[in-house]
């Protein structure tokens, strides 16, 4: 993407375990959440969505769609958000071939399992949209389970997840660049 996380805009598809943690992490790093979805729909706010307030709304009402002042849309619209980064964190087969030309994000991180086919990933690659594959990006659950198994605490878990995913992402992206292929 060539842009630092601080100041980048992002959207998160799915606001469960993966979605809430990635939102917390990115907002703490200085990124700006513009859109988020859950099973009830998608919200968009160009001024940005406040993470603590979003968590409060979800805990009190059961859904992110009750966030005040946000524009509410069908959940599937999340992939068309005008953001730098799109995080998929819920459903499989989210991005279809017909969606490719309307995607505005320059980086897609597959936090969910199989959010698109390899054919879609190739089409996105041809549009210079970087896709971090699901087998790299959503390994956090396995790493977390390992840390729990060895008796580690939450701090150790987050540190190890960050280290391993960052390292593995760099390896996959460097290999793709070297071999002139998509990750």
Task: Spell out what each predicted region is.
Residues 9, 31-35, 62, 84-85, ...:
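Structural motif
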Residues 106-183:
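Adenosine-phosphate binding glycine-rich loop
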């Amino acid at each position: 993407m060539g842009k630092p996380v601080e100041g980048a805009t992002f959207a998160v598809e799915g606001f469960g375990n993966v979605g809430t943690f990635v939102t917390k992490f990115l907002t703490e790093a200085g990124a700006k959440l513009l859109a988020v979805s859950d099973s009830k729909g998608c919200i968009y706010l160009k001024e940005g969505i406040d993470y603590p307030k979003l968590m409060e709304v979800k805990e009190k009402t059961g859904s992110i769609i009750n966030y005040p002042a946000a524009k509410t849309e069908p959940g599937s619209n999340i992939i068309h958000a005008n953001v730098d980064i799109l995080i998929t964190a819920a459903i499989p087969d989210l991005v279809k071939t017909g969606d490719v030309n309307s995607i505005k994000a320059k980086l897609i991180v597959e936090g969910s399992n199989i959010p698109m086919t390899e054919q879609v990933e190739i089409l996105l690659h041809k549009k210079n949209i970087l896709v971090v594959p699901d087998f790299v990006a959503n390994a956090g659950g396995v790493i977390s389970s390992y840390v729990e198994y060895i008796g580690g605490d939450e701090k150790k878990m987050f540190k190890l997840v960050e280290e391993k995913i960052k390292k593995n992402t760099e390896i996959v992206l460097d290999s793709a660049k070297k071999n002139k292929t998509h990750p």
